[in-house]
């Protein structure tokens, strides 16, 4: 997916940045290369520094959520384990869906200053994925540590990708337990 991205472009608006995250998720579903999740990390100026798509099933690795892949790429390109290292500009994560418990934890340690998501965790659970222990306090914890969180940007478009994944009968590897 990284090959299909215009790395020289300045992504000026939140909408443009989220459009990229949703498009990455859509391509991942249409190419049947992974789950319906895409993420991108930008410097606040709009410079793209990392992208990721869900590759859990394809690469047999439960950690390869879109956000985790984007964090790995961005930190590698920054030459630091944290995007908040001295001399680094503020970084922002745009992700097609609200992050799961693992990705929220990684967001805390990644060094991002802002997290923006499209579809909600409830939208993802309705598809059948189990997102783990994500609570309102999870978002509050990040906010108290200086990470701004905004949800619902291009939610309808992100939910369209989730519906398409269901139509194509994509695998649900972390299923919501039956009650």
Where are these regions (language model features)?
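Short cysteine clusters
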Residues: 100-103
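Short loop/turn motifs at secondary-structure junctions and domain boundaries
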Residues: 30-33
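Short beta-strand scaffold segments in enzyme catalytic cores
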Residues: 37-43
